[in-house]
Amino acid sequence: MAFLTRLRSFAAAAWPWVRIPFWICMGLLFGFVLPYTMVLNKRVQDRFNDLVFAVPTRIYARPLPLAASTPMTPAALELELTFAGYSNDGHGQVAGTWLKDGSTYTIASRGYAGPDGGELPKRIRVALGKGQVASVKDAASGKPLELAHLDPARIATLYGAQQEERRIVRLPDVPPLLLGGLQAVEDRDFKHHFGIDLTAILRASFANLRAGHTVQGGSTLTQQLVRNLFLDREQNFSRKFNEALMSILIEAHYDKSRILEAYVNEVFLGQQGSQAVHGFAAASEFYFGRRMEDLKPQEMALLIGMVKGPSYYDPRRYPDRALSRRNLVLDQFVETGLISADQGAAYKATPLGIVTNGQLPHNRFPAFMQLVRAQITSDFDDETLSNGNLSVFTTLDPAAQLYAEQAITTTANSLGKRGEAAQAAAVVTEAQTGAVLAIVGSKEPGDQGFNRALDARRPIGSLVKPLVYLVALANPQRWNLGSPVEDSPISMRQPDGTMWTPKNDEGDSHGEVPMIDGLVHSWNLATINLGMNIGVARIKSFLESFGLTDVNPSPSLLIGALDMSPLQATQLYQYIAADGHALPLVAVRGVVDEKGQTIKRYQVKTGPGEYQPAVRLVTWAMQQVARTGTAASIGSSGLAYLNAAGKTGTSNDMRDSWFAGFTGDHLAVFWMGRDDNKPSGLYGATGSLRAWQELFRKLPTRPLSAAPGDGLEMAWINTSDGKRSEEGCEGARQLPVVAGTLSQDAEGCFWQHVGNLFGGGEQTPAPASTAPTRD
């Protein structure tokens, strides 16, 4: 009682002195601290209750299929592996690595979830030989595999305004060593503190005082998370106060696992240009080229060490610093019992293992991406594409794309001043499906400016001629490749009253010639006379069936007075390359959500082919173009084995150089010309054809069959009337025709034999001219 009495007396005596400070403190508490805490509390709960991270949409190339007999070269396979972020570590044991032993590759794939169902990670052995895959086997069992896929290369990313690279993971999917190591290094009392660790703060303060500068931090993982989610980088008292208070509030509302999961996905771990790398999963791909769950202990240690300063310890810029920091973290792993001392010593002896090509492509191939965007924007809005955590699987073939770019660069450089002044574009597709494998919109790879492949519309010249002949050959009762056409001068009055007098490129004419020669040598007069016989309106209607508009119905259409983009020209030739199937050109296979579920699949619906016998006749004729016609240099360049079918094209005054050609697997269309539409000085055969040849010197592909297609038969034809003849008859040529369309009786050859008996006609069969023209 005496004590209480004395205490009351002391309080009464002290009250006049402490009354004002007391009420000031109470006023601050109820007037500021509590309301401010309530405001921060609402902010914390609003953000954390519906914690949604900005995750971009990633765009991928096509998965690389590997099966026996698939065309493949070592250079192409290694290009694919490097482009997809695989590293040659000499072992091929860990996902994302490979090993070469002679002509055999051991590859540890990473697996993927795609619109085709995807594939699990596996180790495979791929043997190459004679320009193709000799075998594919499971590396563990040695059993042959019918088909394997490598996960596709990432070619672009659609970022939102924040430009953040992130891949969301759930806490159970994070390797335990990474979680344990993170707490051992950054916050050993994480499981027990209430958001701030007073002991750690005091310990860090004494350490910093002794050192004379900052050597140790006292922030908890919760405080670091608050900085990333809510605060700026400014160092002042109010920010420190907010950080501490918000950390306490987070700990009061949410359990440790929720906080740790948010940290693992949010922590800043690097930068590439304007893209910031957030979270351990994204950092794993960025620095090591593989998923977080496939990381080695020393790699986890490096990422944990980088939390302290991602820029300062950047392993690509400052490898020595990064190595020292990693080894220090490994020491702490040993100190806390996460690994043994022997393991720590072994891990410290390893190199950093950083991949040189970080997988954060913003837009590797802008010309191709323009087509991708055009095909998906009707199904997905910009917000969904920027922050929807989607995976878009495209049809791009990295080898085809890079080889096409190199082909244009090499060709332009070889042309001297003509190449310097010219621009170029190319489109490469899968011949049988219409899948777009590559698009080049400029001779400068990566140029994000004008996309000539999609947007430049230029006269296609003789590229239109196979379509004119195709319309004629679609009537096999009237026309075949041996039917005579007039390669003779012609003049016509145009709608404006002027006379149009077309000529052949060489300025000559050849009189009556078989259709095959008119196409093979690209004679303008033969094509015009044939087209006028068919009817320009029919040619116009056929071209419009491919979606073309503003087709000029004048006779000049027959020799290419038609403006088209390289992509549109590819659509025309896709019909021929696909054996008469009108396939739309597609650049996207499908779209997958964050759970690996396919939410959109882009499938090409094909019906029965149209005019297939005529298409096969034109294909055979275009193969002769590549043997003895305007594209005969294909054979002399060492590519005769491809049996390619192709056609050159040159517009008036040599303004535009075109070539379209296909093999058994690929169709490629090239254009070269000047942006100012001045003469380029290039024929189809001296510009674009050379680029096509450069592409197919490198691109693995199957030859096109040299035999006439189904429904055709070889026959001796009298080229003076297009009827059946016999071997040895004057003017007889052996050509493919639609089976059953010729009379079985040879007409007129008997009397020629009679004349020969009396020495009146020792003519030999007239071969096709082998002198290629310049078109």
Residue ranges and their predicted role:
Residues 207-235, 290-293, 360-364, 478-539, ...:
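Conserved catalytic neighborhood of penicillin-recognizing serine enzymes
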Residues 165-171, 247, 251, 307-325, ...:
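Active-site loop and adjoining helix of the penicillin-binding protein/serine DD-peptidase-beta-lactamase fold
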Residues 224-231, 265-269, 289, 293, ...:
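Glycine-rich, acidic and aromatic/proline-enriched surface loops and short helix-turn segments
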Residues 2-417, 435-437, 488, 493, ...:
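Juxtamembrane regions of bacterial inner-membrane/periplasmic proteins
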Residues 261, 265, 346-348, 483-490, ...:
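Beta-strand segments within the central parallel beta-sheet cores of soluble alpha/beta enzyme folds
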Residues 191-201, 277-278, 340-343, 450, ...:
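Short, well-structured active-site flanking segments
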Residues 394-417, 426-430, 439, 445-450, ...:
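A penicillin-recognizing enzyme superfamily signal
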Residues 188-190, 208, 231-232, 266-270, ...:
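Solvent-exposed loop/turn segments at secondary-structure junctions
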